[in-house]
Swiss-Prot record:
Keywords: Cytoplasm, mRNA processing, mRNA splicing, Nucleus, Ribonucleoprotein, RNA-binding, rRNA processing, Spliceosome, tRNA processing. It comes from Saccharomyces cerevisiae (strain ATCC 204508 / S288c) (Baker's yeast). Its main location: nucleus. The gene is LSM5. One of its GO terms (biological process) is tRNA processing. Belongs to the snRNP Sm proteins family. This is LSM complex subunit LSM5.
Amino acid sequence: MSLPEILPLEVIDKTINQKVLIVLQSNREFEGTLVGFDDFVNVILEDAVEWLIDPEDESRNEKVMQHHGRMLLSGNNIAILVPGGKKTPTEAL
């Protein structure tokens, strides 16, 4: 039995109005509610929170957090988009 084909933009479309975690190529992470996107995967987040990650700190515990309202992220810089948002260690179990 073969699985149905799902295209990347379909996955993103199903994530509208849900929390997402976005990791940029520049070691920055954003979490917020995805309220829009286009064919280039430029995304609009509402209630966005940004973490600046120190690539030298493998524990990833040291993060500088900044709160943003609504923001636009360029699809050219997005490395990973995770539906559901950030998981705490207990949620991941």
